[in-house]
Amino acid sequence: EKITTDVLARWKRLNGFNVHFSTGTDCHGLKIQRAAEKAGKSPENFAEEISDGFRELCKVLKISYDDFIMTTEDRHKEVTKLIINKLNENGDIYKGEYEGLYCVDCETYYTEKELEDGKCKVHNKPTEILKEESYFFKLSKYQEFLIDYIEKNPNSIWPEKKRKEILNRIKEGLKDLSITRKKVSWGIPFPLDGSLTTFVWLEALINYLTTIEYPDGSYKDYWPAVHIIGSDIVWHHTAIWFSILKSLELEMPRVVVHGFINLKGEKLSKAKGITIDPLELSKKYGSDALRYFLIREIPFGEDGDFSEEALKN
């Protein structure tokens, strides 16, 4: 992901474009909170360590970003507060109660039909039943807008098969989105009720506007943006993000989706010991060789198989 985005940013700069390449880490939510507890660390320190690891990786892989943002930063909290208040002023937020099946790793609620044998399809883990008082974003209000926009703008989501997947899912019907958490302490306090934290996938998406100084800074020079993302988070970056942007009367970005890297035909998994260490590979073969191999050998938008033998050859 970072290598692909870096290639695009370098190409655009060479062709005279004014580029703002941002990357970073979304640091909040139940997944981070629990991982920090397991490691015996505070969420702040745990998130900082993870972010330092990504910064080091970017340095080794020669990623030419202009801004590395952590969602724990004050600038991001301020923009998040501003945007939530705007959504509320626009009549797109209301208070209610939510009960649903929740995947901690995805930080997302799912319906039963979206699961496979009761497990999240992305992480292959059982979901938890959560019931709590919540504020909601009126996602259902934007269903017809989303269908119309995505159908009329074939380049809005690429590859085409991902655009069709999202479009078909939207046509099945949208439910309003729970945007607060009562049982999660590690997060940005919700502006309308400080006893709640903001849903991580609401505030994490806002980082794109934070890095370009929305609403008073240079954001008009760079928006709408290109988002290069993994196939596991397309829904959040399209159905949810496009609806928020429509409420804010902002243009939609173009969402470009990459696949996953597999190792000997199996998905990467720390738990199963199926891992690739890009830092070690860069030391062994050089970062330029690794960058070139990944860009050349794996068709963009598709899952690709990695082997060290193929890299050597």
What does each of the following model-derived ranges do?
Residues E1-T23, R75-V79, K86, I129-N313:
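Structured secondary-structure scaffolds
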Residues E1-S156:
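N-terminal, positively charged nucleic-acid-binding surface of large information/translation enzymes
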